[in-house]
Amino acid sequence: MAKQSMKAREVKRVKLANKFYAQRIALKNTITNLKLSEEERWDAVLKLQIFPRDSSPSRQRNRCRQTGRPHAFLRKFGLSRIKVREAAMKGEIPGLKKASW
């Protein structure tokens, strides 16, 4: 089970990323636009650097919804491998069954 502070930190990162999403996209488009002057592009780089670190989507980590475990996360279910297995064995995930050959 992940610490509550780690889960809260992840929620904070998601909120910040959503808050600054449009502004970050606009600045990144300005930076990559070669038709603009070098000075305008450099100003956009400096503005982007002022944003909070946690507002970057790449700082987010996928975590299990039930336990908060960051490793062995399965995107399809939003759970870690351990919780997917438990749910599958209980029959809580429709159409998922244990493989046998």
UniProtKB/Swiss-Prot annotation:
GO biological process assignments: translation
Example GO molecular function: structural constituent of ribosome
Domain of life: Bacteria
Short name of any one Pfam family annotated for the protein: Ribosomal_S14
Key words, A-Z: Ribonucleoprotein, Ribosomal protein, RNA-binding, rRNA-binding
Function: Binds 16S rRNA, required for the assembly of 30S particles and may also be responsible for determining the conformation of the 16S rRNA at the A site.
Name used for this protein in its record: Small ribosomal subunit protein uS14
Protein's organism: Buchnera aphidicola subsp. Schizaphis graminum (strain Sg)
